[in-house]
C-alpha cells in the first residue's frame, strides 16, 4: 500500500513550499488509494512549540489536506510526535552500537566541542561526571546510490562524508536518524520532499542499509523560488499559508496555484484539486525551480472567485471576515447576493471584495480623498447632486436601463461633462471612484438607499 507522510517542524507558520509538498503527497495518496500520514518533527526543543503545531494543523485543514494518521487522531504506528518517541530512537541507536555501526563519543566537560575518546561501551563513569556523550554513525567506504523518481540515478561517494551524530548529548536524535526510524516503523513507501533534503539522503540510506531495512522510494522536488531565483523566504515577502488566508486567498485557489508551480497540467490552468486528482502523476513534476508570482496567485484567485457558485462565495466571504475580525452586518439575503455578484467582477481577493462591498454593507462609508478633491469641490457639484436626487425621486421604474437613461439625460443638461456627472454620483452613493458599473451599482443599492446617500453627500458638501 502507498503510505506517504508530511512531516513539518513546528517552528513557525506553514510555508507555501511545505504546503505544496503536502499537496503532492496528499494527491498521490488519494489517487493511489493509500494513506497520508502527518508526523510532527519537534525535536528542536528550543524552537518548536505546540502553538505552531496547532497553526500548521489548522492551515492544512483549511487547505483541504486531511490526514489518515497523525498526532490529533492517532493511528496504528504512533506516537506521531518525535518528542514522544525518544525511547524508540535510543533503543535503535543502541542496536547500531551493538552491531558496531555506531559508537559513543565522549567530550571534554569544559570544552564540549573537543572529543576525548570513542568507545563501543556505554561510558557510564564519564556520563555521571557530566561529560557530554553522543552517538556517531560510522560511515563505511564505498558509494551510496539510489534512483530518484524525478532526478533519476543519483550516486554519492562515501568518502565525502564524515561519521555523523545520530544521538545528541541531550538524548534527542538528530534529524537524519529519527526520520529513518520513523519512516521505517510507520511503513512509509514513498518520500516526496524538497530538494534541499537531497544532501541528507545518502546519510539516511546508510542508516537503512545498517539496519538491513528497505528504503522508501525518494523524490526530491525543486524548490519554490523568489524573483531573484533564490529559495523563497521572508525577505521576498509573505510566504506563509496563514498570510494568504488572511489576505483573502481562497484555499482552492492557493492549492490550484501551488499545483501549477512545477506540475505540468494539461488543459485549463484554473481547476480544483479534485478535478485533476486522477490525472496526477509525480513524474509530471518539473525538475526545475519555479518562481512564486504573487500577481499570478491573485489572478488565479480572482478566477476562482468568479467561477464558484455565489452561495459558495458568500459562505467563503463570511467565514473569512469572521476569521480576520471584520464585521459583516445582517442584510437582506437577495440584496447581499446581488451586491456580491456585481462586486466580485472587480476584485481578486476577499480582502479587496470587503473593501468594494463596504458601501453596500454600511451607510457609514467615508469619501475617498480623490473624490472630494477632484469632484466634490467643483462648483457644479451641488447642482449635479440636487438634479440627480430630483430625477431619481421621479423615477418610477428602478432598473439599469432607466437609471442609465436618467444619468445620460442629466449629463446632457450641460451642468458638467459626462465623466464629472458620473463620478460625482458614483462617489456620492459609495464614497469611491472605482466601483462595479455605476448603473448596476445604483440598481442594486435601490431607490431609497440611493436617495438617502445623495442627501447625505449634499449635507457633507455643505459642511465642507
Swiss-Prot record:
It comes from the Bacteria. It is found in: Cytoplasm. GO terms for cellular component: cytosol. Gene3D superfamilies: 1.10.10.350, Glutamate-tRNA synthetase, class I, anticodon-binding domain 1, Glutamyl-trna Synthetase, Domain 2, Glutamyl-tRNA Synthetase, Domain 3, HUPs. A motif ('HIGH' region) lies at residues 8-18. GO terms for molecular function: ATP binding; glutamate-tRNA ligase activity; tRNA binding; zinc ion binding. One of its GO terms (biological process) is glutamyl-tRNA aminoacylation. Belongs to the class-I aminoacyl-tRNA synthetase family. Glutamate--tRNA ligase type 1 subfamily. This is Glutamate--tRNA ligase 1. The lineage of its organism: Bacteria, Thermotogati, Thermotogota, Thermotogae, Thermotogales. The gene is gltX1.
